[in-house]
């Protein structure tokens, strides 16, 4: 979970803190700042700097921080919950690109979404759940049929 009342830098480095702590557990501020700056540039954040509080960012930039803090780690799986909710079309496309790039790197992604078009466009498999139960799993290879998916959802 992203911390809204703290800086971009702290949000970026918190999930990776054990990766940058020295042998005695001390943190190297210079290394933390460098890591945050690299992430700021890599994720094209529009901000005054990594010392800016996250709550002062636009919705799209908040989402970039939230996604970027995890993609900066060496992950095997990423779970995202409505990653494009409330962002403009440009940021939405950028987030999709980030998720596709993660897939190319071998990071398995579970995307929770309530947008059917998003699920069809991004997924290799769609799992339709209703009332906490899996109703159907549909693979891209068998073809995503929007009407069929809606029928299972209703």
What are these regions, as identified by a protein language model?
Residues 1-154:
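Glycine-rich phosphate-binding loops of nucleotide-dependent enzymes
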């Amino acid at each position: 979970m992203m911390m809204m009342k703290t800086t971009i830098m702290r949000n970026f480095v918190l999930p990776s803190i054990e990766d940058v702590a020295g042998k005695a557990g001390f943190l190297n501020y210079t290394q933390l700042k460098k890591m945050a700056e690299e992430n700021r540039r890599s994720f094209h954040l529009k901000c005054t700097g990594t010392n800016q509080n996250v709550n002062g960012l636009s919705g799209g930039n908040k989402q970039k921080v939230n996604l970027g803090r995890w993609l900066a780690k060496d992950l095997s799986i990423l779970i995202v919950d409505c990653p494009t909710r409330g962002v403009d079309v440009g940021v939405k496309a950028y987030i999709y690109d980030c998720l596709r790039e993660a897939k190319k790197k071998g990071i398995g992604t579970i995307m929770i979404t309530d947008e059917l078009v998003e699920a069809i466009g991004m997924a290799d498999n769609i799992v339709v759940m209703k009332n906490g139960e899996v109703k159907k799993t549909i693979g891209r290879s068998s073809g995503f049929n929007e009407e069929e998916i809606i029928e299972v959802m209703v």
